[in-house]
């Protein structure tokens, strides 16, 4: 049974994983807590605490073995298998998601793409042929897709979420600004670039205020 993690720790571990995987792609064999902290904006002390919490330790003066760290975090997060994804929405955003080369490297495969626009159905986005939304339930069952991504106009989001729930999808990533209503047992993660931008601008404003403050 996988260890139950607090949401905050899970979020930080995914950041460490992403950074370490990128460093491996750049040819690195080891990574320090300071580097992980610098790239994620997390205090290095917190980094060490988090990794100690999952039973992973580094070597003084060397840091953490990158490959071992990736395997440890992937194991804790349950990412050692491949997950098929059903993506609804073949517009600009959906096409960009389907064409991503990063997702497969992280164990996520856009297996099916759906839309209700006749002009989009049948064309290829990424490596996937767009299907009609009416095929969602059947395709999800055949491909064992447990993750759904909503990249539609906001007006269609709730209806799509309902279809995903009916298809037994249990994790939904919502790229719209609609607050979705789903039954217990279904998890919705809202991807909100605006919130991230406001979060970033807050720290930018704080830094500018500190720079403008007179010295004492």
From Swiss-Prot:
Name used for this protein in its record: Redox-sensing transcriptional repressor Rex
Major subcellular location class: cytoplasm
Keywords, ordered alphabetically: Cytoplasm, DNA-binding, NAD, Repressor, Transcription, Transcription regulation
Subunit structure: Homodimer.
InterPro entries in alphabetical order: CoA-bd, NAD(P)-bd_dom_sf, Rex_DNA-bd_C_dom, Tscrpt_rep_Rex, WH-like_DNA-bd_sf, WH_DNA-bd_sf
Pfam families per record: CoA_binding, Put_DNA-bind_N
Coiled coil ranges: none
Keyword Transcription: yes
UniProt source species: Rubrobacter xylanophilus (strain DSM 9941 / JCM 11954 / NBRC 16129 / PRD-1)
Record-linked SUPFAM superfamilies: NAD(P)-binding Rossmann-fold domains, Winged helix' DNA-binding domain
Keyword Transcription regulation on entry: yes
